[in-house]
Structures are given as structure tokens and as C-alpha cells.
Amino acid sequence: MIYTLDSYNPEKEGRLPVFIWAYPREYTSKKVASQVRNSPYRFTRINYGSPIFWALRGYAVMASTEMPIVGFDGDQPNDSFRDQLVMNAKSAIDKIVDMGVGDRDRVGVGGHSYGAFMTANLLAHSDLF
């Protein structure tokens, strides 16, 4: 889900800084990882720690961004955690930039619990942020 202000107009305002909020999930197969788990008909829940707050500050917020970590050929998903994580983050950034919404040079990332572990790994092992 991507959140921006209702008044945001890409033609007038240009590209926005981006905040990616994610939580990686581990899967043992590509088939299971590809299942749809979200719906555009869900209610948006905002609480004191919600990343959606940043949309009110002019960011494009990618909330609940999918970061699947898949085990291949009997390997455990975490055997290739970093590589898949960086690939997922790059894909998310490429998508929002291709949509004309996000600015590739102003991207931040965050998450809670395992999402914080993901954040630390992305900051340490990529040059995306």
C-alpha cells in the first residue's frame, strides 16, 4: 500500500521522499510466497507508532511492503537472507520511482522487531538508503 496526501499531484509537486515500512517473511517455496495476503478493501489502522504519520509530513509511505525470503532447493530461507532482502528493497524502490511518485535519492526504511533487523541489514549491506 502506498500512502500520500490526498492533495499530492506528481506533475505539480514532483517526486516525494519515500519511507518503506516492512517486515520480512520466510517461506519454504515460491508458490507459498506468491499468495496474495492483502486487500485494497481493508481499513487503514493508524496508531501512535504508525508509519502512515510520515505521509502527513510529505513522504510517500510504502506500508506493509512485501519482503519475502524464500528457501530454495531444500535450503533454509535465511541462507540467502541478505541477497533476497536487498533484491526486494531494490524492487520496491524501482517500482515507486517507475510510478513517478518516489525520489530514488531520498528513501528511508524502517520496521518493527524482525523489520528492525531487516532495516539494520539493509543499511549495513546495501547502498540503497
Identify the function of each model-found stretch:
Residues 1-129:
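Serine-hydrolase catalytic core recognition
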